[in-house]
Amino acid sequence: MNEEMEQIIFQIILHGGNGRSSAMEAIAAAKSGDAEEARKKLQDAAEELSKAHHYQTELIQNEAGGEKTEMTLLMVHAQDHLMNAMTVKDMAAEIIELYEKITEQRGASI
């Protein structure tokens, strides 16, 4: 694996991890009643995942252009990390919405 490929893979892992962390922080903020912070953290997660997705797309475009991608354990880990982070972000959005509805039904605002 060449150095450029390693850098792309590490960027996917980095931004995927940052996105997942922000999504988890969004859930924690919603749980504590801070809707504004929850939405901000969810937006942060989306931005980080967008960066990771950019690098993933670069790999796909390179392969579509004839450049073969060497599948390594590190590459599989990066892809798994990104997909997991995307799922966590999607679930965080749903959980935040549930916290908001529950709080609204109780007569307060989250």
Curated annotation (Swiss-Prot):
<keyword id="KW-0808">Transferase</keyword>
<dbReference type="GO" id="GO:0090563">
    <property type="term" value="F:protein-phosphocysteine-sugar phosphotransferase activity"/>
</dbReference>
<feature type="domain" description="PTS EIIA type-3">
    <location>
        <begin position="3"/>
        <end position="101"/>
    </location>
</feature>
<dbReference type="GO" id="GO:0005737">
    <property type="term" value="C:cytoplasm"/>
</dbReference>
<dbReference type="GO" id="GO:0009401">
    <property type="term" value="P:phosphoenolpyruvate-dependent sugar phosphotransferase system"/>
</dbReference>
<keyword id="KW-0762">Sugar transport</keyword>
<protein>
    <recommendedName>
        <fullName>Lichenan-specific phosphotransferase enzyme IIA component</fullName>
    </recommendedName>
</protein>
<dbReference type="InterPro" id="IPR036542">
    <property type="entry name" value="PTS_IIA_lac/cel_sf"/>
</dbReference>
<keyword id="KW-0598">Phosphotransferase system</keyword>
<dbReference type="Pfam" id="PF02255">
    <property type="entry name" value="PTS_IIA"/>
</dbReference>
<feature type="active site" description="Tele-phosphohistidine intermediate; by HPr">
    <location>
        <position position="77"/>
    </location>
</feature>
<comment type="function">
    <text>The phosphoenolpyruvate-dependent sugar phosphotransferase system (PTS), a major carbohydrate active -transport system, catalyzes the phosphorylation of incoming sugar substrates concomitant with their translocation across the cell membrane. This system is involved in lichenan transport.</text>
</comment>
<keyword id="KW-0963">Cytoplasm</keyword>
<keyword id="KW-0813">Transport</keyword>
<dbReference type="InterPro" id="IPR003188">
    <property type="entry name" value="PTS_IIA_lac/cel"/>
</dbReference>
